[in-house]
Each structure stands twice: as C-alpha cells, then as structure tokens.
C-alpha cells in the first residue's frame, strides 16, 4: 500500500516508528506537512497539492495533527477523504475529540464516568460556579490547552476565584473540574486500536506536581487495568468515533472517570513502558480496514 502520514516533523519518535513499521511490512510511506498542502475544492475532481505536485494514489493516511493546527489539518484530511483515501481517524472524529467541551457533553450523554465539570466564559457568580462542582480544591483548565499547559490546581476557594478572574482577563473559555484527590497525581493512558485496549500505562506526576503528562515531567510504568477501566476506554473511543486513540482515565472513589480522549496519542511513552510494538499494530489495523471511501461519513465531513 501507499500510505501518507500527516506530520509536521518526520523526526518525531511517533512518526519515525510508524514509517519503520510500515516499511518493514512492505508499504511505501510519505510524510506530508499539512500546513504546506493547498487544495483544489472541486465537485468532480478534488485535489491536494504539495510542493508543486498533485498528491494522489494513496491508499491510506495517518493523521498526526497537532492541536495548534487542528482546523487546517482536519481540512486537509477531509480533502483526502473526499478523494477516497482511507483515514486512520476521520476528520470529523478528530475535530470532535479536540473540542474538550463537546467531548465531555457527548460522553456524559452516554453515561460515561466523568469528573464533575463546570463550563464558563465570564461567570457573574464565581461562588455559584465553584459550588456546582463541589467547591475547592478544583482543577481549572483553558478549553484550548494541551499537554498539561493551561491547567491549574486551585487548593482553596480564594485561589480558585483568583485563577478564574485571571483567565477571564484572557477572554477565554474555561472548564472547572472537581479534583480527584484519591488518584494521587496518577492517571491511566489506555491505548485503543480498533475497539480494543492494546496497551495501558500509569503516568505519575513528579513530586509537587499534579499533572501527570509526560511533557510535564511525569513518569510512565506498566499497569494492569480492571475490566471496568477497559470497558470505559473502549466506550469512550467508540463515542468519539476514533479508531486509534489514547484514553486518559483517573481512578476515583466512584469508578474510572475519563479526563480526555486523545486522537493523536504519542507512541514513545506507551511503547517504552509496555515494550509493545504499537506502531506495527496500527499499520496492521490499516491493512485490515483500508478500502476506498471506507469512512462513516463517506468523506462528507
């Protein structure tokens, strides 16, 4: 097969591993920077151009789209879908998962365990907002944050008020969530491929930190998850419509709660912690499922 990888950096671990795995299995691979693509929006012959040439003949495309380029990256991916190229994850599913509020609303509607969450822009009554999530301590997040950036733990009511007021000055949308103290600064990353959890790891925040993201200095280790945690991760992936994703869970006193569903999960941490060949499993999934126009939305977005 001829496989495209939408990635801005061919040297990143995840991109390199996907290239290696695909080539080892006899496929032709090309890395494409989504921001350098330009498109011909045509009803009878949609095209993607790149560095002066028309990109065609691809059987599948693997989107590795960073959060900062979600809008343009998904537009490029959607164009490939319209051309009949099989996407590992569909553009509409990526857009859905990148919208933190929409994700939480969809998951809550289907009864998936979540932390108690408030959503606000410029709340008139901060006290009432804090009371709706059970009061301090709370975690306050910028809606557009990623990799633990724009996430603050407010231990007291006054600290929470100060953080919310500061975020108000940014004219930003915020999420205010209950702090799951019993998680002790750890979360679970469940790596889902094709409706199955193929690997899982525990991420532990460094001392004095509550964010367990590896980008924030957290450490990763192998973990055995419970059947309930496994089922929760699979359901979350299905609700988001993602074939491949990382589902982040916290162990709370009332069962597993979903913190995030990541449509472009890093491979390095999970492969290192579990010693599993995740990249090859992703390529194997593509081999099994890649057919022209094989998307739920039929490339309609």
From Swiss-Prot:
Q: Which family does it belong to?
A: Belongs to the RimK family.
Q: Which residues bind Mg(2+) 2?
A: 260, 262
Q: Which organism is it from?
A: Hydrogenovibrio crunogenus (strain DSM 25203 / XCL-2) (Thiomicrospira crunogena)
Q: Which PROSITE patterns does the record cross-reference, listed alphabetically?
A: ATP_GRASP
Q: List the disulfide bonds.
A: none
Residues annotated for Mn(2+) 2 binding in this entry: 260, 262
Stretches assigned to the ATP-grasp domain: 104-287
Q: Which residues bind ATP?
A: 141, 178-179, 187, 211-213
Q: Which UniProt keywords apply?
A: ATP-binding, Ligase, Magnesium, Manganese, Metal-binding, Nucleotide-binding, Protein biosynthesis
Q: How is the cofactor bound?
A: Binds 2 magnesium or manganese ions per subunit.
| Leading EC class | ligase
| PANTHER family found in the cross-reference section | RIBOSOMAL PROTEIN BS6--L-GLUTAMATE LIGASE, RIBOSOMAL PROTEIN S6 MODIFICATION PROTEIN
The Enzyme Commission number assigned here is 6.3.2.-
| Leader peptide range in chain numbering | none
Gene responsible for this protein: rimK
The Gene Ontology terms for molecular function here are:
ATP binding; metal ion binding; ribosomal S6-glutamic acid ligase activity
Against HAMAP family, the record matches this protein to: RimK (MF_01552)
Q: Provide the residue positions that the database annotates as binding Mn(2+) 1.
A: 248, 260
Residues reported in the UniProt entry to bind Mg(2+) 1: 248, 260
Q: What is this protein called?
A: Probable alpha-L-glutamate ligase
Gene Ontology cellular-component terms for this entry are: cytoplasm
Answer yes or no on keyword ATP-binding.
yes
Q: By its UniProt entry, which InterPro entries does this protein fall under?
A: ATP-grasp (IPR011761), ATP-grasp_RimK-type (IPR013651), ATP_grasp_subdomain_1 (IPR013815), RimK (IPR023533), Rimk_N (IPR041107), Rp_bS6_RimK/Lys_biosynth_LsyX (IPR004666)
Family matches, as NCBIfam families? PRK10446.1, rimK_fam
A GO biological-process term = translation
User: What does the record give as cofactor?
Assistant: Mg(2+); Mn(2+)
Key word RNA-binding present: no
